[in-house]
Amino acid sequence: MPKIKTLRSASKRFKKTASGLFKRKKANLRHILTKKNTNYKRCLRKKIILSLSDYKKVLLFLPYL
């Protein structure tokens, strides 16, 4: 049986927490930032826990985490 490959783009985007869930960054913080509010941009810097519907897909991408 060959080894299962890890999807490298997913391994860079998701980090596993101690409880076994995955964290990810929020979107909309790359460009066109001058018209966005400072409070809004500060909230975008925080990490968010992945939803359970996406959790099953990420488990397929990252078999060894």
UniProtKB/Swiss-Prot annotation:
Any one GO BP annotation for this protein: translation
Q: Which UniProt keywords apply?
A: Ribonucleoprotein, Ribosomal protein
Q: Name one GO cellular component term.
A: cytosolic large ribosomal subunit
Q: Which GO terms describe its molecular function?
A: structural constituent of ribosome
Q: Which domain of life is it from?
A: Bacteria
- Pfam families listed in its UniProt record: Ribosomal_L35p
Identify the SUPFAM superfamilies for this entry: L35p-like (SSF143034)
Q: Which PROSITE patterns match?
A: RIBOSOMAL_L35
User: Which family is it part of?
Assistant: Belongs to the bacterial ribosomal protein bL35 family.
Q: What is this protein called?
A: Large ribosomal subunit protein bL35
**Annotated organism of origin:** Buchnera aphidicola subsp. Cinara cedri (strain Cc)
Q: Which gene encodes it?
A: rpmI
